[in-house]
């Protein structure tokens, strides 16, 4: 039975090696070599007892759980320089013995939380040369305790899972070079006691936060685990924030300063420590005082200068820090936005700008004006609805005499969509901050507010509804009697007016004027072009047919033996045939409906004159004066 069993084992071993691969069985470990074989996927018949699997330089595009199922003894997996764009969740779930994973030179864009789950004993992870833009925070959680080498170089990373990297106590080498990292969190490497090489070359780091890790590279002999640190190729901003790094005195590095302008291009370690300075914040401009109506949006602005750029904060009237909430939002540029203001938002706000060199403050006053509704806003009672504005005015006039003997409010020059509101100056002794116009229409019961400066005594209402009835009231907003009182309002007068109905012709023109005018313009251009082409052909054909110019004979006499011939009678020059009469249309300038058509027609007529002036001639003469416009078309 022994010889047949041996043959069976040999046959099974030979069948386990994929056809394009080479299998080597060295000292009880099986190696499957499938590099440079043009594979489009992981061979399904790889021996599950394989210890080393090399699949580099192929065309594999995706990895999934079936590819490495039951390969519990696999130690080294090489997938370099393929076309891998996706790694399925738990694709390496059965590789509990894996020590080295090479995924460099692929096309990975992101790593999810489950992409690298499974290899709990992984020590070397190479992900360089991909297109990684995002790595999930928990992508490295399964091998935090065992990982020794992590290579994330030559990717598009702006952020890396710093919390996971900082929890790798056995990490020796960390390569983050040639990425887009612009900031390092403070203390990111504080727990990496075994780290011996950190490469941050060619990123976007302008500053580095102090970290005890960097001081280990200053004295290689005294440090138990000396650090090789590289951060050249970064746009370092050489100010007081990097003074701690300058004091490390690392003469073997070749870093240079990118800013400020006075230090740009200078060797980092040659700049004296005294030139690593900062500038305290300075409030350049800010909102000094802002008045808003209750319910409106309030935007407080504050801009500060300094080196480094100051951090902006706001303190509210209650001496509390204003943070982001459902009602307010503080932006990093110093803008504070309150979405819907209320009476409790009024008061003094303080803008604070801070940086390592100091701080600066500025005060902004916010006043919230309560919405007036026909009387003094300090009076208690329910707010009138939007449809009873005129009733509120009449009640105030009859009951308390709020409507004083001041010039009445008038609405004149009423059209279908506009009306001019005017009122008198009132009594000089009454201080007025501003005027408020309230109006609504029979088509829409919504009450509309308009704020007018105190220096104005007329206001043009626009965008009214044609053929609608309007009720309008004018109120004067005056300063309150005391600091705790609300704004006082005084009703000046009310008016009722109706807008003109919309003209049917205007609606028709609004619907069709653009298309009709463009059609006429395009047709005119085509007709003019055809006329030019026809005249050119006629002139060329006539010149080619005659060959030479005819001779003109005028008063010619021949000398013969006979008597002189009678002098030919001079014939008057033949008048040219009459030109065909052009059709002219005269626009007298109706501003209501024909304004847009007249402008388009005039523009087309001027273009026709400039391009085909030889055909159109002098055109038609209008009779309406200089203010009238003429549209001309060639028929």
Swiss-Prot record:
Highest taxon listed in the record's lineage: Eukaryota
Cytoplasmic membrane side: 540-635
Residues with the Phosphoserine modification: 585, 626
Positions of the LRRCT domain: 234-280
Domain Ig-like: 281-367
Keyword list, A-Z: Disulfide bond, Glycoprotein, Immunoglobulin domain, Leucine-rich repeat, Membrane, Phosphoprotein, Repeat, Signal, Transmembrane, Transmembrane helix
Extracellular side stretches: 17-518
Signal sequence coordinates: 1-16
Modifications made to the protein after synthesis: Glycosylated.
Domain Fibronectin type-III, first and last residues per copy: 405-502
GO terms classed as biological process: regulation of postsynaptic density assembly; regulation of presynapse assembly; synaptic membrane adhesion
TM ranges: 519-539
Segments of this protein annotated with the region Disordered: 373-410, 555-583
Annotated glycan sites: 25, 70, 324, 333, 376, 440
Compositionally biased intervals (Pro residues): 565-580
InterPro entries attached to this UniProt entry: Cys-rich_flank_reg_C, FN3_dom, FN3_sf, Ig-like_dom, Ig-like_dom_sf, Ig-like_fold, Ig_I-set, Ig_sub
Broad class of the protein's primary localization: membrane
Family affiliation: Belongs to the LRFN family.
Complex formation: Can form heteromeric complexes with LRFN1, LRFN2, LRFN3 and LRFN5. Unable to form homophilic interactions across cell junctions. Interacts with DLG1, DLG2, DLG3 and DLG4.
Function comment: Promotes neurite outgrowth in hippocampal neurons. May play a role in redistributing DLG4 to the cell periphery.
Name the record gives this protein: Leucine-rich repeat and fibronectin type-III domain-containing protein 4
Species: Homo sapiens (Human)
Upper lineage: Eukaryota, Metazoa, Chordata, Craniata, Vertebrata
Gene: LRFN4
């Amino acid at each position: 039975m022994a010889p047949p069993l041996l043959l069976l084992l040999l046959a099974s071993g030979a069948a386990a090696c994929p056809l394009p691969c080479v299998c080597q069985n060295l000292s009880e470990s099986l190696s499957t070599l499938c590099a440079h074989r043009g594979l489009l996927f992981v061979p399904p018949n790889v021996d599950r007892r394989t210890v080393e699997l090399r699949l580099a330089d192929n065309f594999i595009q995706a990895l999934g759980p079936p590819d490495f199922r039951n390969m519990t003894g696999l130690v080294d997996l090489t997938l370099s320089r393929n076309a891998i764009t996706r790694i399925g969740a738990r694709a390496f779930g059965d590789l509990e013995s894996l020590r080295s994973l090479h995924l460099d030179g692929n096309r990975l864009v992101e790593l999810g939380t489950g992409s690298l789950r499974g290899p709990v004993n992984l020590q070397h992870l190479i992900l360089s040369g991909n297109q990684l833009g995002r790595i999930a925070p928990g992508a490295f959680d399964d091998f935090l305790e065992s990982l020794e080498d992590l290579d994330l170089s030559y990717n598009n990373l702006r952020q890396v899972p710093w919390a996971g990297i900082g929890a790798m106590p056995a990490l020796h080498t960390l390569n983050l070079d040639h990425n887009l990292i612009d900031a390092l969190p403070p203390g990111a490497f504080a727990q990496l006691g075994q780290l011996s090489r950190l490469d941050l070359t060619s990123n976007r780091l302008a500053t580095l936060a102090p970290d005890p890790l960097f001081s280990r590279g200053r004295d290689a002999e005294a440090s138990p685990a000396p650090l090789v640190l590289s951060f050249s190729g970064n746009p370092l901003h050489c100010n007081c924030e990097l003074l701690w790094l300058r004091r490390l005195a690392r003469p073997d590095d070749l870093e240079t300063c990118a800013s400020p302008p006075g230090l740009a291009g200078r060797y980092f370690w040659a700049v004296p420590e005294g030139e690593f300075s900062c500038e305290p914040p300075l409030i350049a401009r800010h909102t000094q005082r802002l008045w808003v109506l209750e319910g409106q949006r309030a935007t407080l602005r504050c801009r500060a200068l300094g080196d480094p750029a100051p951090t902006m904060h706001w303190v509210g009237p209650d001496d509390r820090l204003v943070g982001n909430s459902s009602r307010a939002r503080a932006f990093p540029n110093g803008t504070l936005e309150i979405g819907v203001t209320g009476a409790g938002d009024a008061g003094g706000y303080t803008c604070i700008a801070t940086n390592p060199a100091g701080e600066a403050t500025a005060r902004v006053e916010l006043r919230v004006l309560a919405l007036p509704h026909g009387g003094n806003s300090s009076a208690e009672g329910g707010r009138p609805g939007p449809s009873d504005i005129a009733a509120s005015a009449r009640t105030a006039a009859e009951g308390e005499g709020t409507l004083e003997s001041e010039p009445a409010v008038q609405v004149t020059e009423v059209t279908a969509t506009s009306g001019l509101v005017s009122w008198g100056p009132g009594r000089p002794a009454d201080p007025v901050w501003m005027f408020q116009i309230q109006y609504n229409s029979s088509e829409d019961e919504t009450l509309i507010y308009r704020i007018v400066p105190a220096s104005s005594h007329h206001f043009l209402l626009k965008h009214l509804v044609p053929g609608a009835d309007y009720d309008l009231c004018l109120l004067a907003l005056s300063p309150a009697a005391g600091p705790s009182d609300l704004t006082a309002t005084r009703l000046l007068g009310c008016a009722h007016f109706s807008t003109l109905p919309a003209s049917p012709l205007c609606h028709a023109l609004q619907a069709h004027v653009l298309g009709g005018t463009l059609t006429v313009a395009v047709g005119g251009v085509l007709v003019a072009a055809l006329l030019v082409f026809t005249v050119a052909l006629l002139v060329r054909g006539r010149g080619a047919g005659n060959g030479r110019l005819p001779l003109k004979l005028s008063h010619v006499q021949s000398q013969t033996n006979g008597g002189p011939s009678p002098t030919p009678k001079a014939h008057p020059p033949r008048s040219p045939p009459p030109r065909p009469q052009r059709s002219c249309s005269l626009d007298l300038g109706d501003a209501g409906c024909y304004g847009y058509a007249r402008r388009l027609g005039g523009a087309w007529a001027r273009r026709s004159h400039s391009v085909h002036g030889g055909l159109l001639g002098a055109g038609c003469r209008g009779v309406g004066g200089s203010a009238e416009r003429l549209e001309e078309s060639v028929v």
